[in-house]
Amino acid sequence: MAGAGSDSVRKFFATTQSAALFPEYVSRAVKQGIEEADMLPSVIATTTHINSLDYRTIASVPTDEEKKLVDVEEGAEIPETVVRTQESLVTLHKRGRMLVASYEALKYQKIDLFSVTLRQIGAHIARTQFADAVNVLINGDGNENAAATVSAATTGTLTYNDLLNLYNQLDPYCLNRLIMSPSTMLKVMSLDEFKNPLTGINFQGTGNPGNPLGAKLLRTNSVADGTIIGLDAGCALEMVVAADVNVDYDKLIDRQLERAVITTTAGFAKIFSGASAVLNVG
């Protein structure tokens, strides 16, 4: 299926039995594209698979006093932590694409070349889902849990102290992820505090820009310029999956077109609202 001796796609349609394998081939190629471009595992604390379009996540919002494990005298009432369902349902988004190709364009192409196109569809799905996750981190999931915002000391100018303020905003959570746009990443890496020979060597050798404040840096166009999201990836976000990658396939005989519809349905919910915060540089 790959390499110089790769078969053409028409091999799938040589027999009825082999044609039945085509949707599975499409599904696996799209999933591979999602996995290769997917940054969601870096920000998701847990993934929940459901068999319904309605889902309410749970939440526990203890006060500062309730977070303290105080001494309990013998026979005294033990303080409780309440876990409840959220008021608003998790918003699920159905993302997909229809792949339409003529018999000629499809059947006479090599499988490995066609796989590249399918993997790109998967990559687009992954990027769109990551944008959905970013939106929930910033604006909340509809349960009045938008991220706290920290503003830069000087509008339009990013300083090391601004990043420290973001770091402190997450207390008692651990800042281990920073999400920002490419242009904002350049500003971060241009700060004098992050300019050292070791960082430059690692960047040139591995493509990894380093870990400012010990946090993994994620670059994406899903975040507006001048905005930096900081979060504790271990307890900030839940991914809710109603339908994994699904492929429906048919053909239009009168036009000799092959059609494959690729869809996936998922949404995101906040677990602990205080585990994410936003730095607005302006």
Describe every region a protein language model picked out.
Residues N139-P209:
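Extended, solvent-exposed, turn-rich assembly/linker loops in the middle of proteins
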Residues R95-R97, N176:
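Generic beta-strand structural signal
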Residues R97-L170, V278-G282:
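Alpha-helical scaffold segments that mediate packing/assembly in large oligomeric complexes
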Residues Q109-K110, K187-M189, A269-I271:
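Short helix/loop capping segments that flank catalytic or ligand/cofactor-binding pockets
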Residues A2-G3, D7-R10, D192-G282:
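Sequence/fold signature of self-assembling virion shell proteins
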Residues L21-R95:
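Assembly/oligomerization interface modules of large self-assembling protein complexes
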Residues M1-R28, G282:
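Intrinsically disordered, low-complexity terminal tails
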